[in-house]
Amino acid sequence: MARGQAERLMPLLQDILASQDVAWRDLSRIGVGIGPGNFTGIRISVALARGLALSLGIPAIGVSTLDAIRAGTASGIPCVPAPRGQAYVQTETGQPRLVAFDDVEHPALPSAPGELAQAIARLAAAASRDGPPPAPLYVRPADAAPARDAAPRILDDA
């Protein structure tokens, strides 16, 4: 979904629950992908998961996209394509990092969205309920940044 994630996410979740004959009150925890990935999409998903968990009185569990890819693949380096010919990668013992996509040997790319969501759900179900609330996993700073100059003054006409 290129645009409109915030508007479509709640109806989409409601449709998924209804298709499985599950109500919000039936949930015991909420799993959410925390990235790395699309900056805005990750922020929307994490904020929604935290809000739902708070309102339902259940924990929200954050799962790294790279960990979910690793859980769903037999081999390769978990890899998420990033802008400008780069990729987010993570070796088994290392922290996520940003590298040139062409430098990744044997990349394990995200599977179909449904499979990635299932891997996130499995990892969240197996995780401790006592961890910190999920937060976006940022490997690099956002492209947009606050203005460095002071905000302009608005003058009265009087």
Name what the model sees in each region.
Residues R8, L12, A47-G51, T65-A68:
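Generic beta-strand or strand-like secondary-structure segments
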Residues A2-G4, G31, G35, G114:
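Short active-site-proximal "capping" loops at secondary-structure junctions
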Residues G4-E7, I58-A158:
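Oxyanion-binding and handling regions
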Residues L17, G35, R129:
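Short, flexible active-site loop motifs that bind/organize anionic cofactors or intermediates
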Residues S19-R25, A53-V63:
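Phosphate-handling active-site elements
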Residues R25-G33, H106-S111:
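Short glycine-rich phosphate-binding loop at a beta-alpha junction
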Residues R29-P59:
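DPxDG-like acidic metal-binding loop motif
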Residues M1-S28:
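N-terminal beta-alpha supersecondary unit
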